[in-house]
Swiss-Prot record:
NDH-1 is composed of 14 different subunits. Subunits NuoB, C, D, E, F, and G constitute the peripheral sector of the complex. It comes from Salinibacter ruber (strain DSM 13855 / M31). The keyword Secreted does not apply. The gene is nuoD. It catalyses: a quinone + NADH + 5 H(+)(in) = a quinol + NAD(+) + 4 H(+)(out). NDH-1 shuttles electrons from NADH, via FMN and iron-sulfur (Fe-S) centers, to quinones in the respiratory chain. The immediate electron acceptor for the enzyme in this species is believed to be a menaquinone. Couples the redox reaction to proton translocation (for every two electrons transferred, four hydrogen ions are translocated across the cytoplasmic membrane), and thus conserves the redox energy in a proton gradient. This is NADH-quinone oxidoreductase subunit D. Gene3D superfamilies: Cytochrome-c3 Hydrogenase, chain B (1.10.645.10). InterPro entries: NADH_Q_OxRdtase_suD, NADH_UbQ_OxRdtase_49kDa_CS, NDH1_su_D/H, NiFe-Hase_large. Belongs to the complex I 49 kDa subunit family. It is found in: Cell inner membrane. It is an enzyme of class 7 (translocase).
Amino acid sequence: MPQTQKPDFPGNDLGDQFRFWPKHNEKIYERLENKHAWLEEKRAAAQGDGKPPATQRSEVDPLENEMILNIGPQHPATHGVLRCVVKMDGETIEKSVLDIGYLHRGIEKLAEHKTYQEFMPYTDRMDYLSPYSNNVAWCLAVEKLADIEVPERAQWIRMIMSELARISSHCLWLGVGMMDAGAVSGFVWTFQEREEIYSIMDEVAGARFTVSHSRIGGVANDFSPRAIEMIRDFVDTFPDRIAGWEGLLNKNRIWVERNKGVGRVTKEEALELGLTGPNLRGSGVPYDVRRFEPYLKYDEVDFTIPVREEGDCLARYFLRLDEMKQSVRIIEQCLDRMTEGPIRSDDAKEAYPSKEEVYYSMEGMIHDFMYTDVGTVPPKGAHSYHAIEGPKGELGFYLTSDGTGRPWRVRINAPSFTNLQAMEHMLEGEMVADTVVIIGSLDPVMGEADK
């Protein structure tokens, strides 16, 4: 049967005008049908006089030229819609450029068209791996702007839930980090602990993921006896899980070699690049908002700030494990010190009334209607900035009021956006295979970075 001639690759007839792959217009072999013959000729030359075959002889080897590679935005290892364009010499990265904004939704502008309470669910969708931390950061900023006092029990509840959110975020980071390095089973192990935390969130807030449990002036629901029991059971067993992960990874040769000395950032570079959170402390800077600018009840509990001096991916791994241990300490102290009392402000202009008041009293129904319609009204011209120590770093909200129930301006200090600014520096001189490990060690969430 006669063979039909296949058409040339689109653009072959354009010659030098075809620039889809710069410097790759050379024909390594004449046609696809000659591929096997070319490989055999190359093997024969390697066993003979060492000279390359005639079809391969060229002054420039295409494989030794500089190459431009797109990593993302549709790539599972970029932890979201992150695009990184790298210039390589062989497999070594000479330069990289980040291209972000693929998940931009205009959250700051949306906030200006919502009441302060209506914007709460939008914060869940920023860092969607630790939504409770976003809720608390927003509430604290509004409460500072409007000078709202939060009951003590509500502050303890917020602390406990925020630390559970931190553990949940770090568990996902560790599982994904192991999978990025080739250990797929580790992803499943860390999700067992996340599932326990989701069950606690469901019991407390009625939702597993985007909880929206914190409220301006307090929290939506109090802890039930079952919720407290579930939290105590979790903090009793979780340290053993951490010890199991340490036994699995701390001396694992593959894990250590994939992370040690990779993506290194010195203390001076970390400060210049604006790193925050675990990435900053992993480079030797002991800064934690919970200690230096305490909020809620963090100044009443005892905990240490983990710090590592190496500044590489392995240091960031050790630091996040230590952070989870400290979160367990904080939760245990919160449970012991939490007293009975109200969970929301009793001022009808500052917080929603309870459901019992809404259902069984005319005043409660009116207050609920007015707060939903108007919301919190800070003084005109007031402005404030409040930050918390989220799982990714310093998460802050800057608010400006025009005297209405909606903010005049909202500015979000997102740690994922801040940390990504250091990535171009971290990738320089690294192997392209280490790109996914470096991205994972920064732990970015693109919903928060792009806003």
